Structures are given as C-alpha cells and as structure tokens.
Amino acid sequence: MKAEIIAVGTEILTGQIVNTNAQFLSEKLAEIGVDVYFQTAVGDNEVRLLSLLEIASQRSSLVILTGGLGATEDDLTKQTLAKFLGKALVFDPQAQEKLDIFFALRPDYARTPNNERQVQIVEGAIPLPNETGLAVGGKLEVDGVTYVVLPGPPSELKPMVLNQLLPKLMTGSKLYSRVLRFFGIGESQLVTILADLIDNQIDPTLAPYAKTGEVTLRLSTKASSQEEANQALDILENQILDCQTFEGISLRDFCYGYGEETSLASIVVEELKRQGKTIAAAESLTAGLFQATVANFSGVSSIFEGGFVTYSLEEKSRMLDIPAKNLEEHGVVSEFTAQKMAEQARSKTQSDFGISLTGVAGPDSLEGHPVGTVFIGLAQDQGTEVIKVNIGGRSRADVRHIAVMHAFNLVRKALLSD
C-alpha cells in the first residue's frame, strides 16, 4: 500500500504551527507495514486542495487528509473531498448525539450551523469517532483508493489514529526494527564500510543516523511475526558486525548496545551493578558531568562512591594530594595528571575503578593544547590506562559531552575484559 499524507491548513504553510501529525502518522503507518511515499501541505483553499487530490488519487492507494474539520468557514476538507468524489455529506448519528449532549450541558454556548459541519461525513464513509473532540473522522474507498479524513489537533488525531484508523488498516505484515548503537566510529566511515549493504538493500533495510558523539543504525524488515523478523534482522546484523574498518578492526568492537533509549552510561551502570563493582571520578574540564550522568540512574548508590571536581591546579593538588610542583611540571592537561587523578580518586574512595577527565573544553587553547584535547584515565587493580582523544571542531558543550562518552566507553571495555 502506497500512502500519502496531505496536511490542510494555511497556518502550516505560514509557519504558525509545526506539522507534527505527519511525523506521527508516518511512524505509526510504518509500524503496520504501510509505506508513506508523499507528504504535502496545502492551505485552506478549495481549488488547490482539489488539484492536490487529483494528483494524489493517481499516485497513491491511501490518501490521508489531516485538519480542516472544524467549525469555521475555512474548515473545508470534508466538503472538498465530497466534491472531488462526487458525493454528498451526511450526518453521523453517533457524532450528532455527542454534539447534542455537548451543547445541552453548556446552555450559554451559541450553537451555529457551522457546528453541524463537524458531525458530517462523506457519504459511504466509515465514521471514525473522536474521543477528545467533536469533529468526526472518516474512511472510505473509491475506485481503489482509500481516503481518510482526520482532525488537525494532535490531541484529537492521535487517539483516533491509534484506536480507530490503525486497526482498520492492519495488513498481514508489520514493520519490525532494531537499532544498533556505535561509538568510536564516525558516520561517514561507517557508511563507507557498509556501502555494499546500503546500496543493495531491499528487505531488510538499514539506515544510519548521526548523533552527538555516536552513530546508530536502524535495521527494519516487514514480517508477520517478531520471530520471523528476528531471523531476517539477525542475518543483517551479523553481516554488519562482521565488517571491518580500514584498519582491520571489527565493527563488533564499536557496537555497544541496542535500542533508542540505550546509552553508554546506562550500559556501564548496569554492568557495574551486575558485577558488584564501584566507581569514583575526578573531573576537571567536565566539572562533574560524568558523576551527574551516573546519578541520573536509580540505585547507583551501590556502585557510585562519590568523586571530585578539581577544576584548578590548586584544587587538584589540595583535594587529590597531587604535588603542585608535579602538576606544574607536567601540566594540568597531560597524561601524568589524568593518571594521578584517576589513581587518587580510586584510592581515596576505596573504589574498584577511578576515572578521570582533564583537557581543553574551549574556546581558547591551554598549555599549547588545542581545543578538544582530552586525557582520560582509568585506574583499577590491573593498573592505570590513559587515553588521549581529540574532539576538535565542536562546541564547548559538545566537547564536554563527548569526553564523558569516551570515559564511559573506557569503563565499558574494562568491564567486558574482566
């Protein structure tokens, strides 16, 4: 089924409101295996809407119109659709009864002929009751094309779609998706590595999305059951993860989790809980952001001992007992400082892990290091590891955010190696 969404309303074209309905409808239709090929917006104008309906009827098998079902003169969607199809408008008894009750309970409200338009449907249409408003929707098929009219307000449209429309459109297959999350590899490199899979995809499909500091891959397939979908998605996932970078590193090393809501932090927190291990932090440029991120999750008192925010050289020396002369000698942005910060954070809190972050968030360079230079230390029983990352060309906020992601990834790898 090839679907098309037409949003009716001059306020959309003038930018007064954002057309969130199209995004919602496309997402929900995809979930039941209906592909949306076109999204269009048109003003409250009968001639232009008639022209658009003529085009849509030739290229789409499902045409969904949103908006223009209200009680004002410029609400003309149903009237225009009826004219296009050569049909009359008739009253829906259930919607009429709801309208009668509405005004009976509000004797001070003026009932006008325009109010009656809200409870009309195109002749032959299946009414779609409005749970939260008065304007009834409708669905009808003419000459192989299914037409649907829905109210514009999202508070009315969403329940109508979820409870009335989707059950009537259900096909034998649904769209199932799986999201793979990658850290430590850029979108351009990932897309280049997967070029053959992307260029030759049919079903299942994969689509990359760049996010701040990471990349996700959405794998999608149409299937009649979750089990059938898993079989197809498992094959594609293994094909992806079996690929290697130009340096010969498996993509499995960069894939850290699944799902829209998963994050490096959530993975690390859950793994620390599972292994019964604790962590402490000493932060400079991130100023407690790592610790605040840990504290966003419930139940972290069992794994998070506490930490230190040591922004200046003096505080690094005072709070972490690192000799000031050593800090001055090596610099606060250095492998030495990251190492000592991590070790002292671990020692002072008696934690299993001590993580540290020191670097240059910007906008100015520091100690000869360009903006985005970050040293991250991880202290544990096996010793202390320090990595240097360069997060150039980013805002100050992004440098700090991505630095924290690198810190969580360093802890994640250590936990997996245990």
UniProtKB/Swiss-Prot annotation:
Signal sequence, renumbered to the chain: none
Q: Which CDD domains match?
A: cinA
**SUPFAM superfamilies attached to this UniProt entry:** CinA-like (SSF142433), Molybdenum cofactor biosynthesis proteins (SSF53218)
Please name one Pfam family that this protein belongs to.
CinA_KH
- Which PANTHER family does the protein's record reference? NICOTINAMIDE-NUCLEOTIDE AMIDOHYDROLASE PNCC (PTHR13939), NMN AMIDOHYDROLASE-LIKE PROTEIN YFAY (PTHR13939:SF0)
Q: Which family does it belong to?
A: Belongs to the CinA family.
> What's this protein's name?
Putative competence-damage inducible protein
Organism of origin is Streptococcus pneumoniae serotype 2 (strain D39 / NCTC 7466)
The gene it comes from is cinA
